[in-house]
């Protein structure tokens, strides 16, 4: 993802989760009601993406967490797209008859419909013959790249406190919670558009991995956030994933949890154990992004969903 009601304690974070759920409930249910009845069969079409047989027509939509910036081998410099990102790994396992990866670093939901530099509108790659579509989007809509930069810049003001959380809550409302809630209907519109273009496709909404540990001690200097901002940023990531999970459920798509499988491999871990690079990377990958091992882990989560049925969301 490139681009004073104080809530410092557990009770504050609980209220924030309730607020997020309420906002998403009112917005995403309205958005979900707009899905045409014919599109509701998207999760159970005849094409199917599961299993390992040939003949699959797979399209990958997404941002930099999908494209894999700086991970060798880069095959599209304009979108920082690697041929070892998770869509490429999944496509290799599927032995897809056709595979089109149009993910692009910096993409927001609007780039599903609008060109992004030389990368065309991502939804243009989806057609009636598509039978598997993965979507990983939303992080840039909330400005996650700038959030990371802001929190790093504010940390020296109060190294053991939560200056970043205070910054985003200075109006009495947590602005990141609001941004996540506002992004929900945008993601819903993307899923509706995929359903309309590929009515028989299996649609997977891919969540974001675990970036940070619960306790930020020992993370500096590679991850220079204030101590009490670590749980705030961690919870923001969880709220983003919760939104994606709910919007997927309400729009007849399947959610892929990449957070759980990556816990313990965040950017504060040793180079041997980390799957997310810190702000000063030691492996070829973008700061605060999955490295090659992280892309493999996300591919594993997608594959697990593909091969273990459609029952859960």
Predicted regions, residues:
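A structural motif corresponding to the C-terminal end of an alpha-helix
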Residues: 92-97, 186-202, 236-257
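Secretory targeting and sorting signals
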Residues: 1-40
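Serine-esterase "nucleophile elbow" of acetyl-processing enzymes
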Residues: 44-106, 123-124, 152-158
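Structural recognition of the beta-strand scaffold that forms the well-ordered cores
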Residues: 57-62, 66, 98-103, 131-136, ...
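Short amphipathic alpha-helices and their capping/turn segments at secondary-structure boundaries
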Residues: 36-57, 116-134, 139, 187-202, ...
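Catalytic His-Asp segment of secreted/periplasmic serine-dependent ester chemistry enzymes
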Residues: 209-313
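Charged, often glycine-rich, active-site loop that binds/positions anionic groups
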Residues: 106-123, 267-282
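Oxyanion-hole/transition-state-stabilizing segment in secreted/luminal serine hydrolases
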Residues: 69-71, 114, 118-178, 210
């Amino acid at each position: 993802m490139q681009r004073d009601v104080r809530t410092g304690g557990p009770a504050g974070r609980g209220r924030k989760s309730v607020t997020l759920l309420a906002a998403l409930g009112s917005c995403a249910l309205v958005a979900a009601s707009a899905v045409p009845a014919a599109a509701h069969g998207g999760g159970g079409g005849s094409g199917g993406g599961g299993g390992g047989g040939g003949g699959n027509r797979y399209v990958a939509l997404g941002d930099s967490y999908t494209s894999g910036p700086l991970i060798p081998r880069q095959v599209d410099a304009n979108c920082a797209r690697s041929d070892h990102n998770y869509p490429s790994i999944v496509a290799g396992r599927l032995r897809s008859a056709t595979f089109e990866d149009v993910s692009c670093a910096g993409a927001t939901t609007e780039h599903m419909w609008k060109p992004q530099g030389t990368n065309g509108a991502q939804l243009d790659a989806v057609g009636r013959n598509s039978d598997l579509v993965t979507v990983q989007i939303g992080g840039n809509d909330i400005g996650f790249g700038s959030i990371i930069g802001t929190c790093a810049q504010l940390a020296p003001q109060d190294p053991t406190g939560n200056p970043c959380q205070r910054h985003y809550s200075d109006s009495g409302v947590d602005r990141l919670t609001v941004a996540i809630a506002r992004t929900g209907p945008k993601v819903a519109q993307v899923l509706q558009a995929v359903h309309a273009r590929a009515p028989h496709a299996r649609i997977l909404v891919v969540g974001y991995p675990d970036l940070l540990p619960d306790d930020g001690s020992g993370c500096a200097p590679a991850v220079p956030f204030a101590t009490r901002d670590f749980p705030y940023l961690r919870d923001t990531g969880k709220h983003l994933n919760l939104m994606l999970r709910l919007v997927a459920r309400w729009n007849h798509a399947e959610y892929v949890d990449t957070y759980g499988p990556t816990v313990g491999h965040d950017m504060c871990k040793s180079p041997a154990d980390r799957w997310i690079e810190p702000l000063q990377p030691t492996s070829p990958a973008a700061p605060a992004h999955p490295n090659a091992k992280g892309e493999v882990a996300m591919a594993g989560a997608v594959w697990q969903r593909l091969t273990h049925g459609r029952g859960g969301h």
